[in-house]
Amino acid sequence: MHYTRISPALVPSLSPTAAAESSGGGTMIATVFMALLLPCVGMCIVFLIYLFLLWCSTRRRIERLRFAEPVKPVTGKGLSVLELEKIPKLTGRELAVIARSTECAVCLEDIESGQSTRLVPGCNHGFHQLCADTWLSNHTVCPVCRAELAPNLPQCNENQSPC
């Protein structure tokens, strides 16, 4: 094999603009443009999807609230001292038999057998006497079930059992 040497004068030279086009200068601008444009478009699409999901969940929550059963409002100023005295008083031992509960729902402490308690008429929920008096002096509903207290509370003597 015999290689011939080609002189540079025999090879046609390219013009500077043709050399730039053949080296990929135009495609470099397109590559940079796409590298910047595609992430921006992608982030915009993700943001729009986020806004759509947020709108859907808010609309669903509003629909649920519109058709939900209204919460019983706690209104009224509470019971007077005379009305509180009409509510049956029991010992903790008697309350455990009647209400089958040994925890005061107001203070969340256990009711001891010798402690003075009150039994809410109607729903038979029991509480420490001080807790029940404090609650019922500000509210006219049971703190557990929100049942309204009977308008005519039963009259109890010291000798009578509330049962």
Curated annotation (Swiss-Prot):
GO biological process terms, semicolon-separated: cellular response to hypoxia; protein ubiquitination
A Pfam family annotated for this UniProt entry: zf-RING_2
UniProt cross-references to InterPro entries, sorted A to Z: Znf_RING (IPR001841), Znf_RING/FYVE/PHD (IPR013083)
Reaction equation(s) it catalyzes: S-ubiquitinyl-[E2 ubiquitin-conjugating enzyme]-L-cysteine + [acceptor protein]-L-lysine = [E2 ubiquitin-conjugating enzyme]-L-cysteine + N(6)-ubiquitinyl-[acceptor protein]-L-lysine
EC annotation from Swiss-Prot or TrEMBL: 2.3.2.27
One Gene Ontology MF term: ubiquitin-protein transferase activity
Membrane topology category: Single-pass membrane protein
Pathway: Protein modification; protein ubiquitination
Renumbered zinc finger spans (RING-type): 104-146
Keywords annotated in UniProt: Membrane, Metal-binding, Transferase, Transmembrane, Transmembrane helix, Ubl conjugation pathway, Zinc, Zinc-finger
Cellular compartments per GO CC: membrane
Gene3D superfamilies: Zinc/RING finger domain, C3HC4 (zinc finger) (3.30.40.10)
Subcellular location as annotated: Membrane
Highest taxon of source: Eukaryota
SUPFAM superfamilies, alphabetized: RING/U-box
Keyword Membrane set for record: yes
Family (UniProt): Belongs to the RING-type zinc finger family. ATL subfamily.
Domain commentary: The RING-type zinc finger domain mediates binding to an E2 ubiquitin-conjugating enzyme.
Task of the protein: E3 ubiquitin-protein ligase able to catalyze polyubiquitination with ubiquitin-conjugating enzyme E2 UBC8, UBC10, UBC11, UBC28 and UBC29 in vitro.
Name recorded for this polypeptide: E3 ubiquitin-protein ligase ATL23
Protein source organism: Arabidopsis thaliana
Lineage of origin: Eukaryota, Viridiplantae, Streptophyta, Embryophyta, Tracheophyta
